[in-house]
Amino acid sequence: MIALPDTDSEDELPPGWEERATDDGTVCYVNQQGKTSQWTHPRTGRSKRITGELPLGWEKYYDEQGKRFMFLNKETQQRTNVDPRLAFAVEEPTQNVAQVRQRFDSCSTALQVLHGKDLHGRTALITGANCGIGYETARSLAHHGCEIIFACRNRSSAEAAIERIAQERPAARSRCRFAALDLSSLRSVQRFVEEIKQSVSHIDYLILNAGVFALPYTRTVDGLETTFQVSHLSHFYLTLQLETLFDYKTRIIVLSSESHRFANLPVENLAVHHLSPPPEKYWSMMAYNNAKLCNVLFAQELAQRWKQRGISVFSLHPGNMVSSDLSRNYWFYRLLFAIVRPFTKSLQQAAATSIYCATANELTGLSGLYFNNCFFCEPSKLSKSAALQQQLWKLSENLIAELVEQEQH
């Protein structure tokens, strides 16, 4: 049984008040003592709305006089005039980030964040969904009806992940599918996009989850340092190539890390050798830090460029040293991650911020924010440099154009 988050005391109604829902889903507040009603919460001053389909097993019908709606629980035969979705009513979205209240924290799990949500009809594309945080993200969304595209390199691993989800929720099997994507190859990204565009008309959630950590020095088939291409450049290319599948409902989630605060990229004259260094100047930890900074820079610039289209773009930190497959490349980090495991987030907790950014109603209309523990916070000063954001964008565009042209000849 999943433990639900504690009730926010600020959201509790004063004595004598109750919630009711209108036919269009707007929540009103009735003061039984004063015989008055209002559209805003008597304590928070916020308005709410019920959304989505009725919970499983409930149906809505008119009473015998045909004057008001009633609700029937077909399993228990319970009848009530109270809409069961009131328990999951959400605050109307705000354009002011200062008005967003923190509902979850570092202890919250992805499934807690999704409690009461119906995601049937939504489509999520998740890179690296076969293991770790990506798997828990996919699993949680699939449990709530979302269709999942497992964008992974390893077919057998992805299909095994889908099978585990199907064992827990058989109906989810038909909603999950694998599509081959190798982020170390721009050609693979191209083929992946071609396949997706033939089978999908719209993407609601693009979750750029995949990444690498602590790699020995290696180059991709495109000749770039692997950490940089896998963690940033291929995700950059993937996002722009999928642009026609996005609309004002789409949210793009970029997984970064607090490690972005320790990057050493220059603010001026950013060049390829800073991002994809030669072997003699390579340090795996700094390569990771710089790639994570690229993630935030990309998210900030993308949010700015696409803000008129209503597309929301968020970057986030999932948690420190979470026990995932990220540490697989070096024995020291595997040992270190194992030692600190009792003191870090579970994978369900680590996936919570990705899920929150993708689905939270209160984030509608907002973009360009950086999140940690399911709440926005300030990213590094360097990541907020408009000049560096634009330099990285231009460099990424030019680098991809050059590599794609080489591939065609």
From Swiss-Prot:
Residues 11-44, 52-86 form the WW domain. CDD domains: human_WWOX_like_SDR_c-like, WW. The keyword Repeat applies. GO terms for cellular component: cytoplasm; Golgi apparatus; lysosome; mitochondrion. One of its GO terms (molecular function) is oxidoreductase activity. PROSITE patterns: WW_DOMAIN_2 (PS50020). This is WW domain-containing oxidoreductase. The lineage of its organism: Eukaryota, Metazoa, Ecdysozoa, Arthropoda, Hexapoda.
